[in-house]
Amino acid sequence: MSKTIHYQKTHFITSAPDIRHLPEDEGIEVAFAGRSNAGKSSALNRLTNQKSLAKTSKTPGRTQLINLFKVEENCHIVDLPGYGFAQVPLEMKKKWQKSLGEYLQKRQCLQGLVVLMDIRHPLKDIDQQLVFWAVDQNIPVQILLTKADKLKSGARKAQVLKVREAAVDFGGEVEVDAFSSLKGIGVDKLRAKLDEWFAPAFELDDEFIEDLDAE
């Protein structure tokens, strides 16, 4: 029996400059990553039906920390630093890139990665690097083509198909869908994907209860 996850109860736990400052590497984490202007904060707020869970900034590139949110017991969402914004100093870009790579390659409890890309400008070099990193670690990836409301229905579908075809080159488990925080496009599909990734946490709970009942 699948558990209903109440994403609206998601709340902030802590911020960390790198994985060494995160809580214990246990439970299940789903990470969100994307270019600084891809609409990551808006997507997290829409997912959880909260207006300011993830703070949106008028200056892209401000999110320099790894932000951790608790969804349920043993289930967390990780908001990774935005990347690729032109006005950020090169040294800071390198630091963020190292932090992202380190998290994807070393965090054992990472169950899935959501990569957000503006539907009008998808698959930039650093976006692709991020997906390849995840695939190399056998981490499933959900690509969200954000700001889908900016395109008419036909153009939106064509762009999704184009990116799906390109995503075949990544290998691994990579899915592509349109998303709009403003219009709610793709929100239910995103919740369903997160439900799937978080499910093992509740299976462990059920096994624990069964063991207690058997004693």
UniProtKB/Swiss-Prot annotation:
Any one Pfam family match given in the protein's UniProt record, by short name: MMR_HSR1
SUPFAM superfamilies: P-loop containing nucleoside triphosphate hydrolases
Binding site for GTP: 34-41, 61-65, 79-82, 146-149, 179-181
Keyword terms of this UniProt record: Cell cycle, Cell division, GTP-binding, Magnesium, Metal-binding, Nucleotide-binding, Septation
Binding site for Mg(2+): 41, 63
A biological-process GO annotation: division septum assembly
Needed cofactors: Mg(2+)
Any one GO molecular-function label of the UniProt entry: metal ion binding
Any one GO CC term of the record: cytosol
CDD domains reported in the protein's UniProt record: YihA_EngB
Residue ranges constituting the EngB-type G domain according to the UniProt record: 26-200
Keyword GTP-binding: yes
InterPro entries reported in the protein's UniProt record: G_ENGB_dom (IPR030393), GTP-bd (IPR006073), GTP-bd_ribosome_bio_YsxC (IPR019987), P-loop_NTPase (IPR027417)
Domain of life: Bacteria
Listed HAMAP family: GTPase_EngB
Similarity comment: family membership: Belongs to the TRAFAC class TrmE-Era-EngA-EngB-Septin-like GTPase superfamily. EngB GTPase family.
Job description of the protein: Necessary for normal cell division and for the maintenance of normal septation.
Stated name of the protein: Probable GTP-binding protein EngB
Organism: Aliivibrio fischeri (strain ATCC 700601 / ES114) (Vibrio fischeri)
UniProt gene name: engB
